Amino acid sequence: MPALKGKFEFRKSPRTTRRSLLVALGYCLMLSTTLSSCSEAKNNTQESAASPVSVASSSTTEKQLVRIVRSKQLTPLAVLEKQGSLEKRLEPLGFKVQWTEFAAGPQQLEALNANGLDIASTAESPPVFSQAAGVPLVYLATTRPSGKSISLLVPVNSPIKTVRDLKGKKVAFQKASIGHYLLVKALEDAGLKLSDVKSVFLAPADANAAFSQNKVDAWYIWEPFGTRNEQNKIARVLADGGKLRDTGNFYSTSRQFYQAHPDVIKVFLEELEKTEIWTKAHPKEVAQLLAPVTQLDPPTLEKMHDKYDYGLVPITEKVINKQQEVADKWYSLGLIPKKVNVRDGFLTPEEYTKITPSDVLANK
């Protein structure tokens, strides 16, 4: 508070009226109160700086955001957002959920590293590329392996009949994505290498435009892009990843967020697993709920339901070893600059026990 200039002096003078004396006394009282308030505010500020208060401890404090990737697919994560159960669980902890959309897995993990996202949901490959770049991520949970919802598309009138026919052709996919990985495996099964095709790295929206304009010969992509293009008679499915995939998706976070908020992560995984179970058992209701999200009609979504395998599974040595195989594959292809020890991103069994839902742990 700025210093007050001047000096108050009371003289014993007949001119000093009772009124002027009261005015002066009133001003002094106001000054005293103001200085006292300033001093109290200063002390409170110092105390707050010395002893930070949790956002959950005061109803007047703005809630802290937990930023989670938004899913626009037929997934339990999309259902979780629509139903709002996570928000109800986290509110007493002082957290507000913000759902944020990203083009694909690699973009999510870039945001995770830049402190623009707290919880990501990706396939197996994006975390490997992030670890190769030195990102200190943490694998939180994984799902059952399911590749039927990822398809290798060709134009509806394309002469391409088999994967071997892709030799020398332009194939679009998001770099470092599940589409990239399954293309590698599909080509190997057909006796080809990735270098036998012309790779066109495009994010899903850009690849969709290029594919519909016949600027590429094939496209490896996930739902709902595949079904939309089939419905519009733009594409047909050459192959899917059903027999090629032996790892599930991963939920991940930054090491910093995990260490600061294990309670939030535990609540998230509990609500997610409940939603996984509900989604599996209610295909009709899920189709109605997610029709606006996926831009597909409910009957189509009901048919797509069987392309997914629902439920979290425990992170075990088998899961870690399978993920190491993915990392070793990318290194052998020269697509990551160094060997990655994926174990650096996994927690200890004791740490997983603290955050993993009990019914998931029971499936070990």
Predicted regions and their residues:
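Pocket-lining segment of extracytoplasmic ligand-binding domains
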Residues: 125, 199-200, 205-292
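N-terminal secretory signal peptides that target proteins for export/translocation
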Residues: 1-17
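N-terminal export leaders
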Residues: 18-23
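C-terminal motif of bacterial Sec signal peptides marking the signal peptidase cleavage site
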Residues: 33-37
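Short, glycine-/small- and polar/acidic-enriched structural segments
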Residues: 46-193, 199-201, 217-221
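Secondary-structure end/capping motifs
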Residues: 260-337
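Conserved C-terminal helix/tail region of periplasmic/extracytoplasmic solute-binding proteins
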Residues: 328-364
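Bacterial signal peptide processing site
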Residues: 39-42
